[in-house]
Amino acid sequence: MMGMNIDIDSLYDEFSYPSGFAGGHVPAEMPESYNQGQGLAFEKASVLPANATDFFLCLKKEGNTFRTINGELEKYTGVPGEYYLYKKTYYGDWHGGFSYVDLLYPGVTEKFIDVTMNGYERTFGKELGTVIKGLFSDEPNIGNIQGIRWTPDFFDIFEKQWGYDLRAYLPLLVEESGDWKRVRHNYMETLTQLFIDRWSKPMSAYCEKKNLKWTGHYWEHGWPS
């Protein structure tokens, strides 16, 4: 009304934080974004327990490696040995009553963009990328969830990248024995690249397409430690 030009530096891309769950809309519309599990918590046993079928992954130490025995649980139940038993862990629902989402899961970032940015496009139209200059993302992360960070296709991607099955060395992510340094390096490389490919690249591509400068910050005070 006063003939003034007002530029908005950036929009906030989330209901609260961390970015990615769209205030609960992403988990509500895409249950697989959270209900597949995000971590693997383990416990050791000197005898395979009778409830071993409750675990997602059961390993038996043999020499310097670990063998998956999920298909042989009846054979080893009650048998002494060194067993590593893994259960899936999940994000909690403190985010406005909704779970955070697995940014490593295929399609989650695209769903977030669809829900959040399409809403902004409907509201602001051509002002998005002109009057509104950028987008701020707040603490998107893939932090540990009571154990080893994991996503359903992680083992397959890891083996394609490094040529060996991570499950045969999984305990070395928390125990310092054998070739643990190489295993941890490879694990973090795969984990970080998945985060780049499945979160950062789709967000960057969208912002570039819409002439938006993308800024913000990751969970630097708590991840990846």
Regions found by a protein language model. Name each.
Residues 2-13, 131-139, 187-225:
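Aromatic-lined carbohydrate-recognition surfaces of secreted/lumenal glycan-active proteins
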Residues 1-185:
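Mature extracytoplasmic enzyme cores
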